[in-house]
Amino acid sequence: MSGQGNATITNTGEVHTGREQRTTTVTGVATGVSPNKTYQVVQKAKPEFVSFDDGAETSVAKTGGTLTITGKSNSTALTFELLDLTDDGETSGVVEGGLTLTLPEKYDAGGAQTTNGQPITGDPGASAEFTFSITFTNIPANTTINELTAALKVSTTGGQTAQISIKQSAGDPSFEFSEGTITLEASGAAVTNQIISNTAWTLS
């Protein structure tokens, strides 16, 4: 901008998501004035944070497989942990802590594979927030008729945390006999057959 005489300058900036403040210098050049005049503009940092993109809950298919959970942070390091859940039996059809997951040793932080709990290469969060993702593999299929749950917690270097519930849909009801035909002796002695089922049943 340019002008003449007295003026008021309005300073604005883009949203800053980095963990450290940033600065710039404004230089004024005026006719007949030497040296040039400057002032510094300081933009405050965003407090250290971490969040999951899906909020407080995400889901995995009843068939199992792979689940990737994403989020954002500006921390120097992130530490993930699976929480121990105890099923109190109060919610019918749900088994708290019944979903078996294996915590990966590494996750993706801003495109770089990073060891859980270790400093992130290049510290991208100093200048801007970054996207992270953690992928769970080989999740078993749900062979029960109950919803299964697990919980993942992530912590920043500064102690900020986020937690997300992971729910696996109930499996399909199943019922079958181990043998399609059994043979009783003439004496009528007992012969067994096995029922393989995950749901309530009756015989007639």
Model segments located where?
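Solvent-exposed, low-complexity, repeat-rich "mucin-like" stalks and linkers
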Residues: 1, 48-99, 177-204
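Surface-exposed binding patches on compact interaction domains or structured appendages
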Residues: 1-12, 75-133, 199-204
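A short beta-strand micro-motif common to beta-rich folds, especially ectodomain repeats
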Residues: 11, 18-32, 132-134, 138, ...
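Surface-exposed coil/turn segments at beta-strand junctions on protein surfaces, enriched
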Residues: 17-19, 62, 125-129, 143-145, ...
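Exposed beta-strand and adjacent loop surfaces of beta-rich binding modules
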Residues: 23, 38, 77-80, 149, ...
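Residues on the solvent-exposed faces and adjacent turns
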Residues: 30, 138, 156, 168, ...
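Edge beta-strands of extracellular beta-sandwich domains
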Residues: 35-44, 161-169
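Extracellular interdomain linker/stem segments of modular secreted and single-pass surface proteins
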Residues: 43-51, 168-176
